[in-house]
C-alpha cells in the first residue's frame, strides 16, 4: 500500500479536527455546545407519503453529507438506506430557518405548531414520520459528523434515525456564522 504525504496530512488534520470537536463538546459550556432537541416521531393511520407538485429544495453539500452519514449509519445497522425527498428537504430548510430567524430551539413553534403541521400543509401525509433537531454554538463545532455523533449518543434521536419503516429523508441546515441549526425529517 502506497501512502502519500498528502494522505498522511489529510488523516492528521481530520484527527485533529475530530479531537477538537470531541474535546469542545465534552468541555462545552451552554454558550459553546452542540445541542440536540428530543426527537419527535408520530404514527398515524393515513396513506403513504404523497408528493406531487409541492415546493421542493435541493440538498447543499453540508446537508448531503448529513443525509449520507445517516444512510451509512442505517445500512451499517442492517436497515435500508432512505432516499432524499425534495419536499421534505424544503420543509426541513423552512424549520431550520424559522428556528434561526426567531431564535428558539424546540419541536414546537412559538404558536404551538410542529413539523407535522408543516408536512400536512405541504401535502405530505404518512403513517410514520419523525424529526431530529440539532444546533451548534459556536457554528465552527457543527460538522455533519458532530451532529451525527450527538444524535447517536441521544437514545431518542438514535431510535428515530434507526426507525424501521422510514423510506425518505429531508435535511435543512442554516448557518449564521455564530450558530448552526440542522433539521432532519423522515417519513415512510
Stretches found by the model and what they are:
Residues 4-29:
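Sec-dependent N-terminal signal peptides of Gram-positive bacterial secreted proteins and lipoproteins
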Residues 38-65, 71:
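N-terminal low-complexity, Pro/Thr/Ser-rich intrinsically disordered segments
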Residues 51-55, 80, 139:
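Short amphipathic alpha-helical segments at helix-loop
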Residues 3-6, 32, 115-187:
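A well-ordered secondary-structure block
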Residues 47-51, 73-75, 93-96, 125-127, ...:
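A short alpha-helix capping/helix-coil boundary motif
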Residues 58-122, 164, 168-170:
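Short, well-ordered surface patches within globular domains
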Residues 22-44:
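Sec-dependent signal peptide cleavage junction
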Residues 7, 75, 96, 158-159:
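Hydrophobic alpha-helical segments, especially transmembrane helices
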Amino acid at each position: 500500500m502506497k501512502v502519500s504525504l498528502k494522505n498522511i496530512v489529510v488523516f492528521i488534520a481530520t484527527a485533529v479536527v475530530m479531537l477538537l470537536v470531541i474535546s469542545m463538546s465534552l468541555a462545552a459550556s451552554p454558550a459553546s455546545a452542540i445541542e440536540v432537541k428530543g426527537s419527535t416521531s408520530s404514527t398515524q393511520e393515513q396513506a403513504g407519503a404523497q408528493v406531487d407538485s409541492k415546493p421542493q429544495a435541493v440538498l447543499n453539500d453540508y446537508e448531503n453529507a448529513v443525509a449520507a452519514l445517516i444512510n451509512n449509519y442505517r445500512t451499517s445497522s442492517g436497515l435500508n438506506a432512505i432516499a432524499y425527498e425534495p419536499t421534505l428537504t424544503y420543509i426541513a430548510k423552512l424549520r431550520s430557518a424559522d428556528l434561526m430567524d426567531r431564535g428558539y430551539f424546540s419541536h414546537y413553534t412559538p404558536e404551538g405548531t410542529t413539523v407535522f403541521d408543516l408536512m400536512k400543509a405541504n401535502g405530505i401525509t404518512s403513517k410514520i414520520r419523525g424529526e431530529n433537531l440539532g444546533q451548534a454554538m459556536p457554528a465552527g463545532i457543527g460538522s455533519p459528523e458532530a451532529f451525527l455523533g450527538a444524535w447517536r449518543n441521544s437514545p431518542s434521536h438514535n431510535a428515530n434515525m434507526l426507525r424501521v419503516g422510514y423510506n425518505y429523508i429531508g435535511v435543512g441546515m442554516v448557518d449564521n456564522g455564530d450558530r448552526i441549526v440542522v433539521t432532519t425529517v423522515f417519513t415512510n
